[in-house]
Amino acid sequence: MAVYEILKMGDPVLREKAKPVTRFNSNLGRLIDDMFDTMAAARGVGLAAPQIGIGKRVCVVEVGKRRFELVNPEIIEAEGEQCDAEGCLSIPDYTGRVKRFQRVRVKAQDRKGETFIAEGTDLLAVAFQHEIDHLDGILFVDRVENDNPEE
């Protein structure tokens, strides 16, 4: 498997809206496997294809023992609120507090094109939202809450 270089903030690819996947073949499977390897090598919990320079709607998430490959994901239900510190493999050495939904349901496809629903709460919900934001050209720094309400 290959480990890709992760693009850093400032690279224009990170600000582009990724295109839907329409071909479900062995190339997609290899990409997903390589994304899991890249994420693990970087010690992350999620990685979106645009972070490795590929403008497709693909992301991978691993929280605890739960591992997800999300192709063409969309949030179909969300509730609650949480505001916690986030970081990003594309923005090393920076964290900020981000307001996110506490629970989300995501409709996505797997590498074979099969549709499924994934539900996440707490950190898993944050990871889903963070990676789907990447697919829309949004970085977590765009959503950082002001830590000092008097500023």
Curated annotation (Swiss-Prot):
Cofactor section: Fe(2+)
Cofactor remark from the record: Binds 1 Fe(2+) ion.
Gene Ontology biological process terms in this record: co-translational protein modification; translation
The keyword Protein biosynthesis belongs to this UniProt entry's keyword annotation: yes
GO MF term (any one): metal ion binding
Catalysed reactions listed for this entry: N-terminal N-formyl-L-methionyl-[peptide] + H2O = N-terminal L-methionyl-[peptide] + formate
Keywords for the protein's UniProt record, in alphabetical order: Hydrolase, Iron, Metal-binding, Protein biosynthesis
EC number in record: 3.5.1.88
Entry superkingdom: Bacteria
Known function: Removes the formyl group from the N-terminal Met of newly synthesized proteins. Requires at least a dipeptide for an efficient rate of reaction. N-terminal L-methionine is a prerequisite for activity but the enzyme has broad specificity at other positions.
Name of the protein this chain belongs to: Peptide deformylase
